[in-house]
């Protein structure tokens, strides 16, 4: 049985602790009395995955078995989570591949011939052929790509269906083929509690016309937690749930397949990162020293290649299928067993190490706006009831925050950074003054549809994602961050951890740089 997570209180015996810092890492001493949150150990991975998949399809929650829903002559569409999850990408075979092979084989046996597959990339960049192949596997790729396996196109008016409005006036528009199908199967990987459920179809297969109703400043500021989909807790999930209700009321039949992963994130030679520091063996201590030395001395381009090529050995901990709500309830229960840690009381300062990866820079670059999304956005919001830091407290992040952008993937990010953030960092002002122009710009739309660029509006959403955190926090300081870049973001930069902690808490002593 996996050990539960716990909160370590730093004392004289506590060794330096591992901290991520972009495409780097370090061991850091923390002040006495600091509390360090450790997640539960990795849950045991499921063995014989194909058997578990078949069992989930044959014994779904709140639905007939999938075989009973598949009939000759029907129109079947399968939507698949895109490259934004899991993080890092899985080692082959990806769980999506195994699920798809079982679903498609079952459909063939039931006489279903009209089958289309879509990567549910919403306003994310299109996946390349190699990226799609890694997710779905060689067999599915060769059978369907490119005619019947495609990226969803949120700007293709010929393949979008306007469905209606929610009782809150939110417009619902999704992939036309999906809406007109006799059955839509959604294949999901649930990395965190924000994923899955009704956030899958109404977001993954939607257009900007629809997404803008929940990816906005008002929604972000009125969410108590992005990671708590209980009604009334997350405005974005409440909106997606209303949209899901509209889709079902208009005849869309969805069979949801959700999967969960354990915490076995990093492969060798970085497997020591999966363990608590005081439990490192002598070999793992030596591996840390060698890996850090090589990483620190290597050219930046080489380091980037090493990190972006990492494939995670994470194991599958759950496979659930059936009705979306019934499935997601089971999914969240498994996620919580793997991720929840009880923390007693809030702190003055929250410290996080930002890793090299987030949902929007897979095979790409972590640009400054994505640093903002990952820090005050995702990591600040990794709580269920209350933030771990008090209102008005400080957030300290470790990251170099270089002024670097992927010119193909993030063109509108560059322009937002250079044009918009030089004028204002206020999310509401940015939204009202600039969003529509970027969202409807013909060049950005062309790059989204024909190249591999994120939609022109996407960096705005990444900026809004940090709105709740910045509204709540009193200070954000980045250790090792580029001063000019941090200033553009509205942060403070510090050269060392000792300096930054003394700035926000002068009484702190006994700390190393």
Model-derived segments and spans:
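N-terminal active-site beta-alpha-beta segment that forms phosphate/nucleotide-binding
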Residues: 63-125, 373-388, 393-394, 399-414, ...
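Conserved, well-structured core segments that form the ligand-binding/active-site neighborhood
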Residues: 142-346, 353-356, 376-381, 387-389
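N-terminal glycine-/serine-/threonine-rich phosphate-binding loop
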Residues: 40-73
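N-terminal amphipathic/basic leader segments beginning at the initiator methionine
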Residues: 1-53
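Short loop/turn segments at strand-loop or loop-helix junctions that form parts
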Residues: 75, 79-84, 188, 259-261, ...
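N-terminal activation segment of mature serine protease catalytic domains
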Residues: 497-513
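Well-ordered mid-protein domain cores that form the structural environment of catalytic cofactors
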Residues: 93-172
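C-terminal catalytic subdomain
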Residues: 364-365, 369-477
């Amino acid at each position: 049985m996996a050990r539960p997570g716990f909160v370590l209180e730093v004392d004289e015996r506590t060794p330096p602790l591992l901290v991520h810092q972009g495409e780097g890492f370090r061991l850091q001493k923390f002040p006495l009395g600091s509390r360090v949150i450790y997640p539960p150990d990795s849950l045991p991975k499921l063995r014989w995955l194909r058997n578990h998949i078949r069992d989930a399809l044959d014994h779904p929650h709140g639905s007939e078995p999938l075989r009973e829903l598949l009939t000759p002559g029907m129109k079947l569409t399968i939507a698949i989570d895109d490259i934004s999850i899991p993080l890092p990408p899985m080692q082959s075979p990806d769980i999506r591949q195994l699920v798809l092979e079982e679903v498609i084989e079952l459909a063939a046996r039931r006489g279903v011939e009209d089958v289309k597959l879509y990567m549910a990339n919403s306003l994310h960049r299109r996946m390349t052929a190699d990226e799609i192949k890694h997710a779905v596997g060689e067999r599915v790729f060769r059978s369907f790509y490119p005619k019947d396996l495609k990226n969803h196109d949120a700007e293709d008016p010929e393949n979008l269906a306007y469905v209606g409005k929610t009782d809150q006036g939110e417009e619902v528009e999704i992939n036309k083929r999906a809406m007109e199908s006799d059955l839509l199967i959604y294949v999901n990987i649930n990395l965190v509690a924000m994923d899955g459920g009704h956030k899958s179809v109404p977001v993954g297969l939607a257009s900007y016309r629809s997404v803008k109703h929940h990816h906005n400043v008002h929604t972000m500021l009125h969410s108590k937690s992005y990671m708590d989909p209980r009604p009334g807790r997350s405005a974005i999930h409440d909106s997606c749930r209303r949209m899901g209700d509209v889709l079902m009321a208009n005849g869309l039949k969805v069979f949801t397949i959700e999967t969960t992963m354990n915490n076995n994130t990093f492969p060798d030679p970085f497997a020591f990162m999966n363990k608590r520091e005081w439990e490192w063996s002598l070999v793992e201590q030596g591996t840390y020293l060698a890996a850090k030395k090589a990483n620190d001395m290597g050219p930046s381009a080489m380091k980037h290649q090493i990190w972006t090529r990492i494939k995670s050995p994470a194991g599958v901990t759950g496979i659930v299928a059936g009705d979306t709500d019934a499935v997601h309830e089971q999914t969240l229960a498994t996620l919580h067993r793997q991720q929840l840690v009880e923390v007693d009381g809030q702190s003055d300062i929250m410290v996080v190490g930002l890793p090299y990866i987030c949902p929007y820079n897979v095979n790409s670059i972590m640009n400054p706006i994505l640093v903002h999304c990952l820090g005050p956005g995702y990591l600040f919001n990794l709580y269920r009831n209350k933030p771990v830091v008090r209102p008005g407290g400080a957030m300290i992040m470790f990251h170099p925050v270089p002024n670097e952008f992927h010119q193909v993937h993030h063109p509108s990010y560059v322009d937002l950074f250079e044009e918009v953030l030089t004028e204002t960092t206020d999310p509401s002002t940015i939204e009202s003054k600039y969003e529509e122009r970027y969202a409807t710009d013909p060049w950005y739309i062309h790059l989204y549809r024909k190249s591999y660029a994120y939609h022109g509006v996407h960096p705005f959403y990444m900026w809004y994602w940090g709105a709740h955190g910045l509204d709540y926090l009193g200070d954000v300081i980045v250790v090792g961050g580029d001063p000019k870049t941090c200033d553009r973001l509205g942060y403070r930069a510090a050269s060392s951890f000792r300096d930054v902690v003394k700035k926000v808490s002068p009484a702190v002593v006994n700390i190393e740089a």
